[in-house]
């Protein structure tokens, strides 16, 4: 499903002619199987977000190879990556990333519209998804009318609406209290079991990491190895 092979990534800093390469990831390899929840754990600055951005094609590796769903995506251009993300990925963010001027319904509908699906076909899909995440009675609400947990459920519904095979989640409970965090983690586990979706979650929270089938530890850009855990 996801195969990262000997990835290096560096940032260039300094003025032209006096640039310095700052290594962020160093010879990172990991494999995530179909239907797995994989958690990437590490402190701030360890390279977690960089690795997620590499897997999703927002930045390119300095060295190494990335294969996703059997496709070598390492050399993709921006147009190819945009289509690949639309076809294969859903995203969940700590800050929810909802559009303030759109209702719950419209935020969830947006990926369907971007993919060119007819309005007549979109309605039932959105209604079914809102029911699945427990927000069928909040379709007309705007983000500022929802609690943090409800906003994250909208984000999850939006991530799922195109039936992606992979969900990439960046600190998905970082803005939530402990009770709401538990509810969101339960929802992620249910969706994983029901739909066989692969989740890659980056976190520094042990509670979040505890739901993973495997856990990868990043420390100063070095992957310490995958650990299979009982869930």
Curated annotation (Swiss-Prot):
The entry's keywords: ATP-binding, Cell membrane, Membrane, Nucleotide-binding, Transport
**Keyword Cell membrane set for record:** yes
* Annotated binding of ATP, by residue: 42-49
- Superkingdom of source: Bacteria
GO CC field:
plasma membrane
Question: Topology with regard to the membrane?
Answer: Peripheral membrane protein
Q: Which GO terms describe its molecular function?
A: ATP binding; ATP hydrolysis activity; transmembrane transporter activity
Domain ABC transporter span(s) in chain numbering: 4-231
Q: What induces or represses its expression, per the UniProt entry? A: Negatively regulated by YtrA.
Its GO biological process annotations read: transmembrane transport
Please tell me whether the keyword Membrane is annotated for this protein. Answer: yes
Q: Which InterPro entries match?
A: AAA+_ATPase, ABC_transporter-like_ATP-bd, ABC_transporter-like_CS, ABC_transpr_LolD-like, MacB-like_ATP-bd, P-loop_NTPase
Q: Where in the cell is it found?
A: Cell membrane
Q: Could you say which protein family the record assigns here?
A: Belongs to the ABC transporter superfamily.
How this chain assembles, per its entry, is: The complex is composed of 2 ATP-binding proteins (YtrB and YtrE), 2 transmembrane proteins (YtrC and YtrD) and a solute-binding protein (YtrF).
Its annotated function is as follows: Part of the ABC transporter complex YtrBCDEF that plays a role in acetoin utilization during stationary phase and sporulation.
This protein is called ABC transporter ATP-binding protein YtrE
């Amino acid at each position: 499903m996801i195969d990262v092979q000997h990835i290096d990534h560096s940032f260039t800093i300094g003025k032209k002619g006096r640039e310095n390469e700052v290594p962020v990831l160093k010879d990172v390899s990991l494999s995530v199987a179909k239907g797995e929840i994989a958690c990437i754990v590490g402190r701030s600055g360890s390279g977690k977000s960089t690795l997620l951005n590499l897997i999703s094609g927002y930045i390119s590796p300095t060295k190494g190879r990335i294969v996703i769903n059997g496709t070598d995506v390492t050399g993709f251009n921006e147009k190819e990556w945009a289509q690949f993300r639309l076809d294969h990925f859903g995203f969940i963010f700590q800050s929810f990333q909802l559009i303030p001027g759109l209702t719950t319904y419209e935020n969830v509908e947006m990926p369907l519209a971007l993919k060119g699906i007819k309005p007549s076909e979109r309605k039932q899909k959105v209604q079914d998804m809102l029911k699945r995440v427990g927000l069928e009675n909040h379709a007309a609400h705007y983000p500022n009318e929802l609690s943090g947990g409800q906003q994250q459920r909208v984000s999850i519904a939006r991530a799922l609406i195109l039936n992606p095979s992979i969900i990439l989640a960046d600190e998905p409970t970082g803005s939530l209290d402990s009770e709401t965090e538990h509810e969101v983690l339960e929802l992620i586990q249910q969706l994983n079991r029901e739909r066989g979706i692969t989740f890659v979650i980056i976190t520094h929270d042990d509670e979040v990491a505890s739901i993973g089938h495997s856990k990868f530890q990043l420390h100063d850009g070095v992957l310490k190895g995958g650990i299979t855990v009982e869930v």
